[in-house]
Amino acid sequence: MRYLHTMVRVGDLEQALDFYCRKLGLIEQRRFDSEPGRFTLVYLAAPGDVDAPTADAPQLELTWNWDPEHYSGGRNFGHVAFAVADIYALCQKLLDQGVTINRPPRDGRMAFVRSPDGISIELLQDGAALEPREPWLSMPNTGSW
């Protein structure tokens, strides 16, 4: 058995791609449109997984159903997690692009944000935690994460 991907349904594909690719930095690997099924699948990978030694690197599958649907309960899914090279730099980049940092990286190790569809995204500092510092140290939580 091997892990393949995590699928999340999105309400607006372009908005989701803006968040996951432009803001978070994931890279689109492949896309599949199904006319009969009326859906689009987009597979994304973290930059560190793009050149993985096998084609079995984990991916995030975005599923967009062409006919409008309302999805609720993003919180009951749990979260998707990514290891990041510099949690402070990424959180600042996200903040500068209008993304709410729901759980700031006060400890230099962990932060949470949400996708446009309400999916909780955990960001973990790769390796040892960074030294706690401002503005993150005194930044309060916003909403749920």
Where do the language-model regions lie?
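Eukaryotic phosphotyrosine signaling hubs
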Residues: 3-5, 75-80
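Core segments of cupin and vicinal oxygen chelate
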Residues: 7-57
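Vicinal oxygen chelate
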Residues: 31, 82, 88-145
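Short glycine/serine/proline-enriched coil/turn segments at secondary-structure junctions
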Residues: 35-36, 70-72
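Short, charged/polar surface micro-motifs in flexible loops or helix N-caps
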Residues: 47-51, 67-69, 87
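Short, low-complexity disordered segments enriched in Ser/Pro/Gly and basic
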Residues: 55, 71-75
